[in-house]
């Protein structure tokens, strides 16, 4: 009896203790840019779906003769880690000294990593889990800071006071890649501007209005374009300007241009330069006149009250409205003016598009998302965050002249917030103050290939062969990695990028705690086994979304058991027989070898193309329908006629089936391969089967005709509720020559006592 959980635990420990997947450089090297998961939560079904994909290829390429560098890492710095630590350890920066806060974050991250390692370990990933990187480590900090200094010296990173996106909840600047569009219910407020009515969802920014904007083709406003109107309550004048971007059907077709209500405001402000009125200060609205230090909600309520009291409010109506929100917390963002660090990207869009075209996208249509993102970029990448647990900027500022002072590379890693410096500004002053911001976590994740390769002192192997990631972070992780690769190396970061879809519950719903439909990977592994979970992960094409369907997990578990039973049958049938495949005579063996080689060729081509689901389906069809249902049944008698040949062929096929399943289902295949080859270190280190034309026999597939007859007799017995081993007498019409050549096989396999054969164009069977 096979205990799947016990078996899987045995081989996990075996791989780990014997360093089976330790990277050993060779002549052919294959490098995977592994996504480093954050430590801000548990492994979820999205991980359990996407991470096996990279392991399929890692195991396959090892068997194809490559030295596979499949590294592991944790993205354990930045805002997600801070949020996790504050929740788990009940500490905040407000009541904890910075050095102590950093220490607590680091300790909590390390504790979480130990638990998370087991989650990925349980999936059967063939990483070298003994040698992983952490983005918060001194090693990663040094490299991040060094590359940042290079960008500054090459005028690709700069500090500027400019409009920037800010999250009021997270209290930090963010970048365009951190935003998502969210539809919310809000009030559309209609306001009277000296006879022209405008509609706005941000009435609290009335004191920041610097212009009114209409569409130049709107007949209602053509005559008043370029005229001036008075801003209600504030009594200053603004000009009415026109722009094609204004939707004539939204509200009244006339809008306020404020500094700044949203990204559209910023675009118009940059285009027309109407002046600036900043009233958002420290996440509060403060115009010094009407609104003084109120939150957005409080300010909105107050300004509507004042408009109503002064007869400027026409009406309000409830609408659904799309707003920019922070992807991390869902808070609507604000745009303020502040000093931040940026990496230039707007001036190299063409180069980034060219690099995207040099990468093979799997599936190809996912490249369009990257191209649309790059083409639509409107901001340089803001990389500074007003947070605490992240990569420090290796920067000081001169208090006397405002100059920027960079750390020497020999000093790295350095945290200017916690350590003094003897450096002096170029003006001669030693009166320096540290940069207190930290780098965006994407600024470190975007150099993952560099971190992994420098971890083994092998930058000469750049670029990596492939990156596996979700489609939801094409505009963040894929984009920033390509950007950094261009800026530092003028090269692609990887030759291929494989994009996976989302995971949904059995009914196609997105999983969430509020819906109560969360499914834990550990629960599935405990019930069905990791091999079954990996089988489920191989059921969709690249880029496709997937449902958690029990039938896929059941099918995976059944495949584990079927492999186990068929392997034991082959071992039993071939026991104590010295096999040989030097001269294949048996019609059955010639047929099965021809079928196998054609299957092998198809599966190999599909695996080479990263079509894991189609490859596994091809293999499933051969294993279940051809090998198990027919060949294994036939050789129970055939082995008596051709013992040496059939013993050798059956073992050859079973061993190669095990090898071909091993990238997808590594646990059961490791167990079974050791039954056939006790001295093997691992099936994953064995050679993948190679297509052999010598085993393609002319006319061998004519035996499909006999298989069709056998299946029809099976169906008859089943309909008659007869045991497959029960004797039966039949009259069989068909191709008399083909049937006579295999009559003994038909009689033996289907227990036909009396077989009457006659010629016919079609197969006809009658029970006698």
Swiss-Prot record:
ValRS has two distinct active sites: one for aminoacylation and one for editing. The misactivated threonine is translocated from the active site to the editing site. Keywords: Aminoacyl-tRNA synthetase, ATP-binding, Cytoplasm, Ligase, Nucleotide-binding, Protein biosynthesis. The keyword Protease does not apply. Disulfide bonds: none annotated. Belongs to the class-I aminoacyl-tRNA synthetase family. ValS type 2 subfamily. ATP binds at residue 513. Transmembrane segments: none annotated. This is Valine--tRNA ligase. Its EC number is 6.1.1.9. InterPro entries: aa-tRNA-synth_I_CS, aa-tRNA-synth_Ia, Anticodon_Ia_Val, M/V/L/I-tRNA-synth_anticd-bd, Rossmann-like_a/b/a_fold, tRNAsynth_Ia_anticodon-bd, Val/Leu/Ile-tRNA-synth_edit, Valine-tRNA_ligase_type_2. It holds the Pfam family Anticodon_1. One of its GO terms (biological process) is valyl-tRNA aminoacylation. Its main location: cytoplasm. GO terms for cellular component: cytosol. HAMAP family: Val_tRNA_synth_type2. One of its GO terms (molecular function) is aminoacyl-tRNA deacylase activity. A motif ('HIGH' region) lies at residues 37-47. The keyword Cytoplasm applies. It catalyses: tRNA(Val) + L-valine + ATP = L-valyl-tRNA(Val) + AMP + diphosphate. It is found in: Cytoplasm. Catalyzes the attachment of valine to tRNA(Val). As ValRS can inadvertently accommodate and process structurally similar amino acids such as threonine, to avoid such errors, it has a 'posttransfer' editing activity that hydrolyzes mischarged Thr-tRNA(Val) in a tRNA-dependent manner. A motif ('KMSKS' region) lies at residues 510-514. It comes from the Archaea. PANTHER family: VALINE--TRNA LIGASE, CHLOROPLASTIC_MITOCHONDRIAL 2 (PTHR11946:SF93), VALYL-TRNA SYNTHETASES (PTHR11946).
């Amino acid at each position: 009896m096979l205990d799947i959980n016990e078996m899987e635990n045995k081989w996990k420990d075996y791989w780990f203790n014997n360093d089976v997947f330790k990277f050993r450089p060779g002549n052919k090297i294959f490098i995977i840019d592994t996504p480093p998961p954050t430590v801000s939560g548990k492994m979820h079904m999205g991980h359990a779906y996407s991470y096996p994909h990279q392991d399929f290829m890692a195991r396959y390429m090892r068997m194809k003769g490559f030295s596979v560098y499949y590294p592991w890492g944790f993205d354990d710095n930045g805002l997600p880690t801070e949020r996790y630590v504050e929740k788990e350890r009940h500490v905040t920066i407000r009541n904890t000294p910075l050095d102590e806060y950093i220490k607590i974050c680091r300790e909590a991250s390390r504790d979480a990593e130990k638990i998370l390692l087991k989650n990925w370990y349980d999936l059967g990933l063939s990483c070298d889990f003994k040698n992983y990187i952490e983005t918060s480590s001194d090693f990663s900090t040094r490299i991040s800071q060094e590359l940042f200094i290079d960008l500054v010296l090459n005028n690709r990173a700069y500090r500027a006071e400019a409009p920037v996106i800010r999250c009021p909840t997270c209290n930090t600047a963010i970048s365009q890649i951190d935003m998502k569009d969210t539809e919310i219910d809000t009030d559309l407020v209609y306001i009277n501007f000296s006879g022209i009515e405008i509609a706005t969802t941000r009435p609290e920014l009335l004191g920041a209005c610097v212009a009114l904007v209409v569409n130049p083709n709107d007949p209602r406003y053509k005559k008043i374009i370029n005229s001036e109107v008075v801003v209600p309550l504030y009594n200053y004048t603004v000009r009415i300007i026109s722009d094609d971007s204004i939707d004539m059907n939204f509200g009244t077709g006339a809008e306020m241009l404020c500094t700044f209500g949203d990204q559209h405001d910023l675009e118009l402000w940059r285009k027309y330069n109407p002046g600036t009125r900043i009233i958002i200060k420290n996440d509060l609205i403060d115009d010094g006149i009407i609104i003084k230090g109120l939150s957005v909600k409080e300010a909105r309520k107050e300004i509507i009250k004042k408009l109503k009291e002064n007869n400027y409010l026409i009406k309000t109506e409830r609408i659904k409205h799309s707003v920019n929100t922070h992807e991390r917390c869902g808070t609507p963002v604000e745009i303020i003016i502040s000093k931040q660090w940026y990496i230039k990207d707007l001036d190299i869009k063409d180069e980034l598009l060219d690099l995207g075209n040099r990468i093979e996208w799997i599936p190809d249509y996912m490249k369009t998302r990257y191209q649309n993102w790059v083409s639509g970029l409107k901001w340089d990448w803001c990389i500074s965050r007003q947070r605490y647990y992240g990569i420090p900027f290796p920067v000081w500022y001169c208090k006397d002249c405002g100059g920027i002072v960079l750390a020497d590379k020999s000093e790295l890693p350095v945290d200017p917030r916690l350590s003094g410096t003897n450096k002096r500004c170029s003006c001669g002053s030693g009166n320096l103050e540290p940069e207190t911001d930290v780098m965006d976590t994407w600024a470190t994740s975007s150099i993952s290939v560099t971190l992994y390769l420098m971890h083994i002192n092998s930058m000469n192997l750049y670029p990596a062969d492939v990156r596996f990631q979700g489609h939801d972070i094409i505009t963040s992780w894929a984009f920033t990695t390509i950007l950094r690769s261009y800026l530092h190396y003028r090269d692609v970061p990887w030759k291929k990028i494989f994009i996976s879809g989302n995971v949904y519950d059995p009914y196609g719903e997105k999983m969430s705690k509020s819906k109560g439909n969360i499914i834990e990977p550990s629960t599935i592994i405990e019930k069905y086994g990791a091999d079954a979970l990996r089988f489920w992960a191989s059921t969709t094409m690249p880029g496709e979304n997937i449902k958690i369907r029990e039938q896929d997990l059941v099918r995976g578990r059944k495949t584990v058991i079927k492999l186990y039973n068929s392997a034991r049958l082959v071992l039993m049938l071939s026991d104590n027989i010295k096999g040989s495949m030097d001269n294949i005579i048996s019609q059955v063996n010639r047929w099965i070898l021809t079928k196998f080689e054609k299957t092998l060729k198809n599966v190999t081509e599909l695996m080479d193309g990263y079509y894991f689901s189609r490859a596994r389906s091809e293999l499933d069809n051969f294993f279940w329908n051809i090998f198990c249902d027919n060949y294994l049944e036939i050789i129970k008698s055939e082995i008596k006629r051709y013992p040496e040949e059939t013993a050798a062929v059956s073992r050859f096929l079973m061993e190669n089936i095990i090898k071909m399943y091993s990238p997808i289902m590594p646990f059961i295949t490791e167990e079974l391969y050791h039954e056939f080859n006790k001295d093997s270190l691992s099936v994953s280190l064995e050679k993948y089967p190679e297509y052999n034309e010598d085993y393609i026999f002319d006319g061998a597939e004519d035996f499909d005709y006999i298989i069709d007859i056998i299946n029809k007799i099976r169906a008859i017995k089943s309909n008659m509720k007869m045991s497959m081993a029960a004797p039966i007498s039949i009259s069989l019409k068909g191709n008399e020559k083909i049937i006579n050549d295999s009559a003994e096989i038909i009689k033996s396999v289907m227990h036909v006592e009396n077989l009457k054969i006659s010629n016919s164009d079609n197969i006809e069977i009658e029970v006698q």
